[in-house]
Amino acid sequence: MDTYKTIVAPCEGILTEKRSKFIAMAFPVTTLEEIKEHLAVCQKKYFDARHVCYAYMLGHERTNFRANDNGEPSGTAGRPILGAINSRELTDILVVVVRYFGGIKLGTGGLIVAYKAAAAEALDVAEVVEKTVDLTLDVYFEYPMMNEVMRIVKEEEPTVVEQDFQMDCRLRLSIRASRMPRLRERYEQLALETGRIRVGEE
């Protein structure tokens, strides 16, 4: 699988359940540092809220995730939020749900339903985009090999990320993961035939 889904921009949803108010916010993120920054902002903005719960998912393989109940009964907040993320197969996303207690206890089952529904309120208005997993390949070659190297670029259509055309030339190419083996194979074959280029993958 070399595609994944994430959201384009932050979005928000609000849910009221038995006088408790749930404010859900979803953010596109790619690092733990970004997540910490968003959480700090939310905790400061909603300092008077009873609970600030969250869940996140990172990486195109969707293996880096966490759910936090922030004082709610175990498993009643973070996991339902994560469930809303999983049901949409999203990644590189943080969802925060703030709860203002309305005086009526919701019970364990009620909390699970409410937190998942609140997260869904935000995610239902999110603009979702499908992205490709791209890999990069460095090609080092002598200047006289320029035509052969660029012919492969034209035919395979990778994105040229960086280029340096001195006596010792270098191209950094980016291409969808599923197409990388063919691109690499073509340059390795050219290297075998000429001995005047070499390839390296990041």
Stretches found by the model and what they are:
Residues 127-143, 171-173:
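Short glycine-/aliphatic-rich beta-strand segments at the starts of folded cytosolic domains
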Residues 159-165, 191-202:
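Conserved short beta-strand edge segments in small beta-sheet-based binding/regulatory domains
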Residues 77-125:
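Active-site beta-strand/loop microenvironment that shapes enzyme catalytic pockets
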Residues 140-157:
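Short amphipathic alpha-helix segments
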Residues 1-75, 198-202:
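C-terminal regulatory domains involved in ligand/effector binding and gene-expression control
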Residues 173, 179-182:
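Terminal, non-globular segments
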Residues 43, 85-89, 116, 120-127, ...:
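Signal for well-folded cores of large energy- and translation-related assemblies
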Residues 25, 52-54, 92-96, 138, ...:
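Structural motif
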